[in-house]
Structures are given as C-alpha cells and as structure tokens.
C-alpha cells in the first residue's frame, strides 16, 4: 500500500487553467517534504527544459502518475500504475488541458497502457480520448532519468522542439 508508506499525497501544482498538463512518474522524498511536484535537482532540470522552449514553469500544471512516494523510490509496479490510472485520467479531465506531456515510463503506462521501452515511444505525437475529448500527447524522458543518463538529453531536446511546434500549430497561448 503506497499510501501507508508515504508521508503525504502530492496531488499537483501549477496553473490549473493551463493548456499544458505535464505528468511525471511519482514523487520523491524532496517532493514529499515540500508538498509539491518536481522539486530539487529534478525540478531545476524541468524548469530549464521548459524555459528552453519559452515556457515558465508556473504557466503549466504538473502532477504525477502516482501521487505517493514509493518505498526506497523504486519504480511503481504495473499493478500500482493500473490502480492509480483511473484517478489520473479523472484528474486530466478536471484540468482539461489541450496538450499532455508524459514524462517517463510510469506516465506512459498509466495513460497509454504501453509498458515497452520509452525510447521506442518517445517523441511521437499520439492521441488519447478521455470523456469524449481527444487530447494530443507526447512521451519523453523524465528529468530524473535524464539526470541519471545525461546522454539522453539530446533526445529530450528534440521532443521539446516538437512540443513547441505543437503549441504553435494549435495556437495555444502560454
């Protein structure tokens, strides 16, 4: 039970009216201590990534696929991901974004059901239908993964450029 092993639920933060919703994997200890998503070194990298495409972090809404820290910060199991995915989809429907950015394999599995290698799916625009609304989404590496494997940052940069182009294509003000 993830809830029993966590200090608190990390729901989401940022602009609830944002046209962009970013979904990460799950909170870490820094997130839990501060009660916010994407804190510490991970948050610093995310902020830099967004600024690289002229988006201020406070102009997006971010949350996690699973809102509780896992024991020893391990990757959530497929069963845990599935348990929280309906809650996450409802969360997306409430925020009602125009674009979803899925960061990491947990987010990819929670929303798309795919559990193959993220490198096979990243950088491709896909669509998901939630409550009769079609949303474009893109999958990319999570900031925590990029910190562990910095050589993948070049691929994330390509993904970020695609996000910037989609924002322009859809004439989204951010």
Kindly give the residue locations of the regions a language model identified.
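A polyanion-binding, active-site-adjacent surface
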Residues: 1-174
């Amino acid at each position: 039970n993830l809830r029993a092993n966590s200090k608190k639920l990390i729901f989401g933060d940022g602009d609830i009216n944002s046209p962009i919703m970013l979904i990460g994997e799950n909170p870490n200890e820094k997130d839990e201590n501060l009660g916010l998503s994407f804190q510490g070194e991970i948050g610093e990298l995310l902020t830099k990534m967004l600024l690289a495409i002229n988006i201020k972090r406070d102009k997006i809404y971010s949350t996690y696929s699973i809102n509780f820290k896992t024991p020893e910060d391990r990757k959530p199991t497929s069963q845990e991901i599935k348990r929280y995915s309906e809650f996450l989809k409802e969360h997306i429907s409430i925020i009602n974004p125009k674009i979803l950015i899925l960061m990491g394999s947990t987010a990819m599995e929670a929303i798309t059901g795919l559990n193959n290698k993220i490198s096979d799916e990243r950088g491709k625009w896909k669509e998901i239908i939630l409550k009769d609304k079609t949303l474009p989404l893109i999958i990319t590496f999570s900031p925590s993964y990029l910190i562990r494997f910095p050589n993948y940052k070049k691929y994330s940069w390509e993904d970020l450029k695609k996000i910037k182009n989609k924002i322009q294509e859809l004439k989204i003000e951010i």
